[in-house]
């Protein structure tokens, strides 16, 4: 079945398992090395053995190892259960995004690997080494155990810090910006509008289900290079879109039926699907994560997390409007692949902001609604005309929610500012609607 499904094992290694497994393997190798050293009886090693024996006397090694090992395992197990329970609890409040970010952090992976590796070290040493000779093994166990206790304190702090809404949002924003920077290079190789619409087209349909996680432009470029005449591939879905069997993936256009058949096969070979979206390949997923977190937070009674999320979306808009992707004009179309891919990342951010404003009704968060309107007012002057129209449409859909909030000074300022900006940039109908809403809210105040 095509598109080919991404390997679950490879994804697990990339997302979390690679670092812990490598560290565990390192501890197992350390256990083997110290066991071999304990079994050696060579003259040049004896001064080292006598020096270490003062720290770990052979007569006490057996009881020391059998006491330290279970104690460390119990302590680590209890701590891990408590930390994972806390992470799960925060996921209930801020959606599953918290768990996903927790798993993908390299420092968390290293701590998990260290603690599991230390446990493996104890098991191997107790199995292989004669307790009366376990000098090197015992010293290594003591040093590693002290380091584990220190690491446990550091890990506990890091987990608590990572669960703060600003930390979660900042991490998502950083990853999304980095992924977007890579995607911009990719977008410069494709068109954003078709130019060969007069040619016959053949639809390309999915044979399996999953999320589109990758498009190999090199594969498409090679296939297009073998076409006998003019040809073009227009994608109907985007990275992160969910597909099912029979979903339209793309349309291939070429005069020759054989070219269309070969290009359709190349499209299916160039795509990869997976069971979940991937932030390291698709910036829209980062926007979706912030939107989900913002919606969940906006429906709660505490506005702090929702406000932080809105600020994160504002950061993305500010960064991307400064570094806008060049449009595919007629002069540089010749340098681009005849592949059409429409980017909707900025409209996704605008939609996420409007969604959070709607969700703020449930939590009664007039602060969040005002912040969203303020972000629209700050961002609209920096958007392209097309994105400005999209922003004004999102404002129009969010307007009914404004009347459901108490009319605070913060909300009053946001409405006034947004109305002025919309009027300055030619969206007079929505600006007038904002003015009517503001006047209606003012008449509800005592003394009016």
Region annotations inferred by a language model:
Residues 1-5, 10, 135-138, 153-239, ...:
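Short basic (Lys/Arg) and small-residue
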Residues 5-23, 52-70, 94-113, 133-141, ...:
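Membrane-interface segments at loop-to-transmembrane junctions
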Residues 10-11, 15-44:
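Hydrophobic alpha-helical transmembrane segments of small proteolipidic membrane proteins, enriched
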Residues 29-42, 55-129, 149-156, 294:
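Transmembrane alpha-helix detector for multi-pass membrane proteins
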Residues 44-54:
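Membrane-interfacial helical/loop segments at transmembrane boundaries in membrane proteins
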Residues 47, 91, 268-269:
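A short glycine/small-residue-enriched secondary-structure motif
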Residues 142-149:
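Hydrophobic or amphipathic alpha-helical targeting/insertion segments
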């Amino acid at each position: 079945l095509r598109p080919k499904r991404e390997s679950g094992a490879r994804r697990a290694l990339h997302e979390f398992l690679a670092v812990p497994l490598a560290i565990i393997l390192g501890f197992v190798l350390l256990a083997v090395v110290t066991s071999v050293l304990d079994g050696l009886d060579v003259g040049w090693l004896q001064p080292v053995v006598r020096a270490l024996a003062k720290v770990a006397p052979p007569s006490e090694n057996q009881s020391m190892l059998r006491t330290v090992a279970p104690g460390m395992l119990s302590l680590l197990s209890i701590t891990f259960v408590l930390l994972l329970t806390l992470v799960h609890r925060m996921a209930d409040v801020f959606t599953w995004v918290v768990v996903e970010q927790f798993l993908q952090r390299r420092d968390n992976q290293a701590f998990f690997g260290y603690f599991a590796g230390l446990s493996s070290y104890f098991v191997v040493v107790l199995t292989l080494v004669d307790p009366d000779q376990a000098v090197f093994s015992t010293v290594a166990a003591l040093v590693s155990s002290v380091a584990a206790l220190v690491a446990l304190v550091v890990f506990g702090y890091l987990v608590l810090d990572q669960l703060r809404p600003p930390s979660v949002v900042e991490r998502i924003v950083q990853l999304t910006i980095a992924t977007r920077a890579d995607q911009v290079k990719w977008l410069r190789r494709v068109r954003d509008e078709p130019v060969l619409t007069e040619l016959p087209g053949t639809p390309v349909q999915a044979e399996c289900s999953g999320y589109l996680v990758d498009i190999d432009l090199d594969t498409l470029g090679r296939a297009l290079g073998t076409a006998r005449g003019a040809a073009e591939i227009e994608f109907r879905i985007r990275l992160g879109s969910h597909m099912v069997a029979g979903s339209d993936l793309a349309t291939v256009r070429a005069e020759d039926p054989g070219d269309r058949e070969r290009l359709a096969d190349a499209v299916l070979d160039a795509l990869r699907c997976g069971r979940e979206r991937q932030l390291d390949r698709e910036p829209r997923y980062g926007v979706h994560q912030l939107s989900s977190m913002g919606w969940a937070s906006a429906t709660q009674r505490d506005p702090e997390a929702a406000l932080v999320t809105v600020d994160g979306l504002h950061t993305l808009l500010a960064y991307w409007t400064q570094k806008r992707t060049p449009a595919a004009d007629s002069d540089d179309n010749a340098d681009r692949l005849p592949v059409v891919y429409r980017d909707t990342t900025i409209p996704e951010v605008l939609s996420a902001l409007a969604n959070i404003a709607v969700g703020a009704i449930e939590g009664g968060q007039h602060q969040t609604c005002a912040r969203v309107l303020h972000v629209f007012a700050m961002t609209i002057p920096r958007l392209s005309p097309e994105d400005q129209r999209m922003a004004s449409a999102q404002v129009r859909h969010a307007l009914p929610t404004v009347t459901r909030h108490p009319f605070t000074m913060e909300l009053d300022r946001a409405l006034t500012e947004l109305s002025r900006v919309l009027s300055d940039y030619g969206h007079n109908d929505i600006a007038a609607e904002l003015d009517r809403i503001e006047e209606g809210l003012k008449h509800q105040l005592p003394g009016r």
